[in-house]
Amino acid sequence: MLTKKLKSRCPSAVKIDVCRTKEYTLKFHKVSSDDSGKGDMAKAESETDELYGVAFSIDKSEESNLDGAEGYGHGYEKTEIDVEGITKGPLRVWTYYATNIDPELKPYHWYKRQTVDGARENGLPEDYIKKIEAFESIQDTDVERVAKNEKYLS
């Protein structure tokens, strides 16, 4: 969701719209190779659940860059879902979903901050941003990985 990070992988990325669905909710339980939890959409469990995100278009030639960075085929798969674009109305988008989850995992502080920064940058509702901020996160002890990822933060 953080444009700077996405553009480092897919320079052609152009924002289409902020999107919402009541069919899914945000979790940070995708098993990552760095032993933390990464963001994932999970089936909604209650009527108050919702998932916001940002739809981007990218050149087809860059799709493999994004697939590699996201771990497609290694804990993430792709699917198409119907969402409601805030300004454009109904949209059909493809997204990644986790196939290897562990509900005990927590995101690293820097990862959660990237998620919050991306939500703010793209104008997601403040009450939704507060929900993201409420997720517990943990310290990453790998200082090189922290430095590499904090460069995307504002």
Regions found by a protein language model. Name each.
Residues 1-154:
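Glycine-aromatic micro-motifs
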